[in-house]
């Protein structure tokens, strides 16, 4: 009798164990808010379902992905049954989420692809409990709903973990780099990152593709894996500037970020976006530090005040105090935004407001650059006391060996760099989102400020240049007014005109080529001959729109680098043709490009940028020497529109569509087509025109308003 009872007990125990294993093999459906009394009813319903045929089970539940989830959940349940039970009981009894530190025990590869709903109410409490308990994460059936939620991950994390004000201010104070150093390190790192990305994609393209395991092999590998909690995946390497010697930190390296657990929740693209916004804030802090040094160390120096006349000091330092005040307020607002939450909500709304209302001080400062440079050179030449004092101040350890002139150009460098930083943010925000609209508006305002700065500089120098040219010209034909507010010089130089072989009475052959001098303005061509006294005698002219050029095929050394210039209507209202010879191939192409800018180039026409034309990135800075040349900054990306055999490239810079010539030795070519395509895609996104949908969205929202409740 006792033996039969023991056998019955053993069968009952085996049956319960078998039912438990079957339950473990199914996706977790037990909600954390269920009471212990309800678990028996749920278990009984599960037993009935196990006996019924499985004809209505969705296909998703039997996928490779969900089989791996069930297998890992089963392994964790075997290893830590007591811990799971205690965590579940605590969360049910106390009604609190175990996930206080925002650390979700969901592998990054198992998370929804883009958006996750995490609300700060009772519903969010339930989801937090289920996700914080190992093995009881959101079921695969729930993930599509989470992914389709309109609440973005950044909005969900808003106001969860603010950064203490003292901690953030200490970080700002610890930035040991002056802006000149910060900017150089950042651009050099950008170049190196592109090189690495180019090499990685080339390796993936040329090498063997990654091995794809069959479902059977994948199951065998996972069965052999030891039962262990999900491992933390390596964080994406955004850049390599976290050098301990440079004191240049990344957002993801902040102690508050590491301890909060948000790096386990955010997607890699969102982390890159956070890094882009963080760089804008920290670079502004570095810029403010350098600008403050210009004022305190140089401008307010008592000896400099005694040496310089007030008018000289005004030209030299301009309105730098106004620029410093704007930078201080701008940085303060960025600091407040950082203190609100460890996950930065946005910074482009602040940038937009300041660009629209306060950055006009940059236009005033930069427009004075021509007079500032001239005054500085004159002071160095004429006042020895000033020259010696500046050299002495530059040796101070505060200046880090940087020259005084590098501090004077800080505002122009900053306003240009700020536009590029907003572009980096714009490339990483989600498309058709509010943050994209805000970034586009901020970029548009900054672009207007930068253009106004450039026009201010050019206007000052162009006016003086036009007056100087007008004084040197003597007209053999009807006089043409040169000075105009809408006219500026594009190119000037000497060419040789082919006049044809002629024989004089003494049977001596005259010269085949005669020197002429061309002044090409944006709307006018003036053809001259140089005469003694540094004067130019004008003998022909034509509107620039009535010029045509044609390149001759190489017909030997004599006719090398020869092209035909045709004036459809010259000063005498008739057509004229000139056969001109340049000193080199690059000089010939540069003249042809300037004279007729709408002709087709070697790689792509000027009316189309859709072709996969070659690209280069600048690895050495270059300052334009002539009006048709392009000044290059480190890390600039350019489309190659034309190039010559003697080492010159005619290109278009992607971030502002400026075109010009530059030496090929200043750049290196981007060989990978995927990188080139990505660069063009980002360029089109940054410069896309406002569509009707975006215009409607812009009317509905108010810039700068944040929902922080």
Curated annotation (Swiss-Prot):
Residues 1-143, 194-233, 686-709 are annotated as: Disordered. This is Ephexin-1. It comes from Pongo abelii (Sumatran orangutan). Residues 1-272 are annotated as: Regulatory region. Residues 213-226 have a biased composition (Acidic residues). Acts as a guanine nucleotide exchange factor (GEF) which differentially activates the GTPases RHOA, RAC1 and CDC42. Plays a role in axon guidance regulating ephrin-induced growth cone collapse and dendritic spine morphogenesis. Upon activation by ephrin through EPHA4, the GEF activity switches toward RHOA resulting in its activation. Activated RHOA promotes cone retraction at the expense of RAC1- and CDC42-stimulated growth cone extension. Src-dependent phosphorylation at Tyr-179 upon EPHA4 activation increases the guanine exchange factor activity toward RHOA. Phosphorylation by CDK5 upon EPHA4 activation by EFNA1 may regulate dendritic spine morphogenesis. Interacts with CDK5R1 and EPHA4; activated by EPHA4 through the CDK5 kinase.
């Amino acid at each position: 009798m006792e033996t039969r009872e023991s056998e019955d007990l053993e069968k009952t125990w085996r049956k319960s164990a078998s039912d438990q294993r079957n339950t473990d093999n199914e996706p977790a459906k037990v909600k954390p808010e269920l009471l212990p009394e309800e678990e028996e009813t749920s278990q009984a319903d599960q037993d009935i379902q196990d006996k019924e045929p499985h004809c209505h089970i969705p296909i998703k539940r039997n996928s490779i992905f969900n089989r791996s989830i069930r297998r890992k959940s089963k392994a964790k349940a075997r290893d830590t049954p007591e811990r799971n039970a205690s965590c579940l009981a605590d969360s049910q009894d106390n009604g609190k989420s175990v996930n206080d530190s925002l650390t979700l025990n969901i592998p990054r590869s198992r998370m929804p692809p883009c958006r996750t709903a995490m609300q700060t109410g009772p519903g969010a409490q339930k989801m937090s409990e289920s996700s914080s308990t190992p093995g009881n994460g959101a079921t695969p059936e729930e993930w599509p709903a989470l992914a389709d939620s309109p609440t973005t991950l950044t909005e969900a994390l808003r106001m969860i973990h603010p950064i203490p004000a003292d901690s953030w201010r200490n970080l700002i104070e610890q930035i040991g780099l002056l802006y000149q150093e910060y900017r150089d390190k950042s651009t050099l790192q950008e170049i190196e990152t592109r090189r690495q990305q180019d090499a990685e994609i080339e390796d993936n393209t040329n090498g063997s593709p990654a091995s794809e395991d069959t479902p059977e092999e994948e199951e065998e590998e996972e069965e052999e894996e030891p039962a262990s909690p999900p491992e933390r995946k390596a964080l994406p390497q955004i850049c390599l500037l976290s050098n301990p010697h440079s004191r240049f930190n990344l957002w993801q390296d902040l102690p508050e970020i590491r301890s909060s657990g948000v790096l386990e929740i955010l997607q890699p693209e969102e982390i890159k976006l956070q890094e882009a916004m963080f760089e804008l804030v920290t670079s502004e802090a570095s810029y403010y530090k350098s600008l403050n040094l210009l004022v305190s160390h140089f401008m307010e120096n008592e000896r400099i005040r005694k040496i310089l006349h007030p008018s000289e000091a005004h030209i030299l330092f301009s309105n730098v105090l106004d620029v410093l005040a704007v930078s201080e307020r701008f940085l303060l607002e960025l600091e407040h935004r950082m203190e609100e939450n460890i996950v930065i909500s946005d910074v482009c709304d602040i940038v937009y407001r300041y660009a629209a209302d306060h950055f006009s001080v940059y236009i005033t400062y930069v427009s004075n650059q021509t007079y500032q440079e001239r005054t500085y050179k004159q002071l160095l030449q004429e006042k020895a006391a000033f020259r010696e004092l500046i050299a002495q101040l530059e040796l101070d350890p505060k200046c880090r060996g940087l020259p005084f002139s590098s501090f004077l150009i800080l505002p122009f460098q900053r306003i240009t760099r700020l536009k590029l930083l907003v572009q980096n943010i714009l490339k990483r925000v989600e498309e058709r989102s509010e943050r994209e609209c805000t970034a586009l508006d901020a970029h548009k305002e900054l672009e207007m400020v930068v253009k106004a700065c450039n026009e201010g500089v050019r206007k000052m120098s162009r006016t003086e240049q036009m007056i100087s040219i007008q004084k040197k010209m003597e007209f053999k034909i009807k006089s043409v007014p040169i000075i105009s507010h809408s006219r500026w010089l594009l190119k000037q130089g000497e060419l040789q005109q082919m006049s044809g072989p002629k024989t004089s009475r003494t049977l001596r052959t005259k010269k085949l080529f005669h020197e002429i001098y061309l002044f090409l303005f944006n709307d006018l061509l003036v053809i001259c001959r140089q005469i003694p006294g540094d004067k130019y005698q004008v003998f022909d002219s034509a509107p620039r729109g009535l010029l045509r050029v044609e390149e001759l095929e190489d017909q030997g050394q004599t006719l090398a680098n020869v092209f035909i210039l045709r004036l459809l209507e010259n000063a005498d209202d008739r057509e004229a043709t000139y056969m001109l010879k340049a000193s080199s191939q690059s000089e010939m192409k540069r003249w042809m490009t300037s004279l007729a800018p709408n002709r087709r180039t070697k790689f792509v026409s000027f009316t189309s940028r859709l072709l996969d034309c070659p690209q280069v990135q600048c690895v050495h800075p270059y300052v334009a020497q002539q009006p048709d040349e392009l000044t290059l900054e480190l890390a600039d990306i350019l489309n190659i529109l034309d190039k010559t055999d003697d080492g010159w490239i005619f290109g278009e810079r992607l971030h502002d569509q400026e075109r010009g010539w530059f030496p090929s030795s200043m750049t290196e070519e981007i060989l990978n087509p995927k990188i080139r395509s990505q660069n063009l895609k980002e360029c089109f996104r940054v410069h896309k025109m406002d569509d009707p949908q975006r215009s409607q969205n812009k009317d509905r929202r108010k810039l700068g308003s944040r929902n922080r409740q």
